[in-house]
Amino acid sequence: MAPPRNVVKIAVQMSDAIPQLIQLDQAKPLATVLKEVCDTWSLTHPEHYALQFADGHRKYITENNRSEIKNGSILCLSTAPDLKAQQLLSRLQNASREGCCEVLRNLVPLASDMTFAQEVISRDGLQKLSTIIENGDDLGEMLALGLRAFLELMEHGVVSWETLSISFVRKVVSYVNMNLMDASVQPLALRLLESVTLSSPTLGQLVKSEVPLDRLLVHLQVMNQQLQTKAMALLTALLQGASPAERKDMLDCLWKKNLRQFIYKNIIHSAAPMGDEMAHHLYVLQALTLGLLEPRMRTPLDPYSQEQREQLQALRQAAFEPDGESLGTGLSADRRRSLCVREFRKLGFSNSSPAQDLERVPPGLLALDNMLYFSRHAPSAYSRFVLENSSREDKHECPFARSSIQLTVLLCELLHVGEPCSETAQDFSPMFFSQDHSFHELFCVAIQLLNKTWKEMRATQEDFDKVMQVVREQLARTLALKPTSLELFRTKVNALTYGEVLRLRQTERLHQEGTLAPPILELREKLKPELMGLIRQQRLLRLCEGMLFRKISSRRRQDKLWFCCLSPNHKVLQYGDVEEGANPPTLESLTEQLPVADIRALLMGKDCPHVREKGSGKQNKDLYELAFSISYDHGEEEAYLNFIAPSKRDFYLWTDGLSALLGSTMGSEQTRLDLEQLLTMETKLRLLELENVPIPEHPPPVPPPPTNFNFCYDYSMTEP
């Protein structure tokens, strides 16, 4: 007879005792279960004990999380969290230095458990830890353990970072600013200051004033990836918390101190692989730097500004008066004005007054900045562009100003200028760190590409939008390759000629047209069930391989890893926490189990409980797109197993696999792409013998039936 649904068979162990094999009734109060376990071992005062998972993070079992106990789980009987917290804190207060280190070694692994953390915090544990950190009697292991325990407790979000004292923050800052410091202390101090900066504007200003940028640069130049990453994290946090004017001053200072060159040579081109966290911080640094262009992009040209009028005149003179000699010398004012209007027309402005062209935002004054940069840093290419096109009379001239304005808009869209930073993106461009003024330099390459493409297309003014579409495709395809330098970008984008773009488009079009013929569609429909079964099998295999996921804390930091996989028999999901940098665990080491039969539904995006309350701003979009949850039976209630996929592809593979596991339709974009690819290959294999044979749109007509079915055989014909 099968045991009731709410009964699980588990083992309970205790040091120096024979383990117990019991049937745990999940409907029975936990206090009653504890009393029964203690009675078996003849232990008094069961309220002084608690159950923990024996493996992994040794989480305390409470009424809220007892549903995580599955058949075969191994538990251990240990000291209750309130008593354990009291014991450790009492020893911490009166112990010697070595005794404090021993207490902290026991405290750190337990601090990640919410139940234990609440007990420590309620007994002023944070205050005791802050005293150890502020005293700084030991700048080695004890300080590192104290910082780690403090961070683990604060990450639960029970206490606000804004409650920290100024003296405490200053002491942590002093550890960052010290020259001779234990290698394990400074990354933890930097991590703490990053959390303070992101959570408290007031304390963030204190950190900004107390931590010199030069000191962060020193940490970045140490060949220690963990220290580099935490220093970059604090740097981007300070930049995000600064006002636009302060941010500009800080970035100008950093570029003058060769931060860009160091990132390019020692981080991007480092022999060691770059971590995800560092890639995210480089993306943030790139986005914040490009964000400095937003005010110019949002500001229209002021026709009454003397400075801006002089810039327009400088642009005209660089093209038509290269030697500084005015062609209008000796002419009347009206004649000179008429000459200027004509020359601005030759420059490619659509209106008689250039100010009218530059009133559009975006790109506003950023387009004028780009044109001036091109004229000053590539004067020969600028003059050749303008004079070559202004001298043509066959309507094939490429308007420089109009092209520059539209191209600036295009570059802002491709590089997401002015958009808020994503909290999870890692999509930075190595080329951005290869040289100064990268946006303007990119414009110089793009405007010459536009002129080249214009000639290849033999375009006229009516073809302007078509040319811009081709240039957008050329730039987008090349940026997607992530070239590491501007010269490499120039080489690749110039190799992608208009003819090559046409070839790519033609290939895609022929591919689409080939799959739209009715006989091909019929064949594809017959192949779909078999290929969908193949995709389903691949998705389930991917689940069996397992994957590392990151946990999101109360401040949505993705800094803890856990592993999840499907058992080979496809009946159980197994999961558990793992350490950063560790190899994926084996199935035997994963003690957490979720039977597939207990799963109710698969939730995605904003329906997930772990992102439902995060708001609806643009910064949450990436998080929503990567979030999914499994709801399952938790006694009579519903519980959730929450995921944040590392990438969009992994999100599709896992949600498809879970849908297949639950018997639902696999409806992701990745499934559609995989099915299309398999259908294309299989169709081509089936049609190999019909190469160069036209496939009719409709089947041949069936001939009419004969007038009668009286078949006749001529018996007069005899065989010889």
Swiss-Prot record:
<keyword id="KW-0053">Apoptosis</keyword>
<dbReference type="GO" id="GO:0005737">
    <property type="term" value="C:cytoplasm"/>
</dbReference>
<keyword id="KW-0729">SH3-binding</keyword>
<keyword id="KW-0963">Cytoplasm</keyword>
<dbReference type="GO" id="GO:0017124">
    <property type="term" value="F:SH3 domain binding"/>
</dbReference>
<dbReference type="InterPro" id="IPR006816">
    <property type="entry name" value="ELMO_dom"/>
</dbReference>
<feature type="domain" description="PH">
    <location>
        <begin position="541"/>
        <end position="663"/>
    </location>
</feature>
<dbReference type="InterPro" id="IPR001849">
    <property type="entry name" value="PH_domain"/>
</dbReference>
<dbReference type="GO" id="GO:0007015">
    <property type="term" value="P:actin filament organization"/>
</dbReference>
<comment type="subunit">
    <text>Probably interacts directly with the SH3-domain of DOCK1 via its SH3-binding site. Part of a complex with DOCK1 and RAC1. Interacts with ADGRB3.</text>
</comment>
<dbReference type="Pfam" id="PF04727">
    <property type="entry name" value="ELMO_CED12"/>
</dbReference>
<comment type="function">
    <text>Involved in cytoskeletal rearrangements required for phagocytosis of apoptotic cells and cell motility. Acts in association with DOCK1 and CRK. Was initially proposed to be required in complex with DOCK1 to activate Rac Rho small GTPases. May enhance the guanine nucleotide exchange factor (GEF) activity of DOCK1.</text>
</comment>
<protein>
    <recommendedName>
        <fullName>Engulfment and cell motility protein 3</fullName>
    </recommendedName>
</protein>
<dbReference type="InterPro" id="IPR011989">
    <property type="entry name" value="ARM-like"/>
</dbReference>
<keyword id="KW-0581">Phagocytosis</keyword>
<dbReference type="InterPro" id="IPR016024">
    <property type="entry name" value="ARM-type_fold"/>
</dbReference>
<dbReference type="GO" id="GO:0006915">
    <property type="term" value="P:apoptotic process"/>
</dbReference>
<dbReference type="GO" id="GO:0048870">
    <property type="term" value="P:cell motility"/>
</dbReference>
<dbReference type="InterPro" id="IPR024574">
    <property type="entry name" value="ELMO_ARM"/>
</dbReference>
<dbReference type="Pfam" id="PF16457">
    <property type="entry name" value="PH_12"/>
</dbReference>
<dbReference type="GO" id="GO:0006909">
    <property type="term" value="P:phagocytosis"/>
</dbReference>
<dbReference type="InterPro" id="IPR050868">
    <property type="entry name" value="ELMO_domain-containing"/>
</dbReference>
<feature type="domain" description="ELMO">
    <location>
        <begin position="307"/>
        <end position="479"/>
    </location>
</feature>
<dbReference type="InterPro" id="IPR011993">
    <property type="entry name" value="PH-like_dom_sf"/>
</dbReference>
<dbReference type="Pfam" id="PF11841">
    <property type="entry name" value="ELMO_ARM"/>
</dbReference>
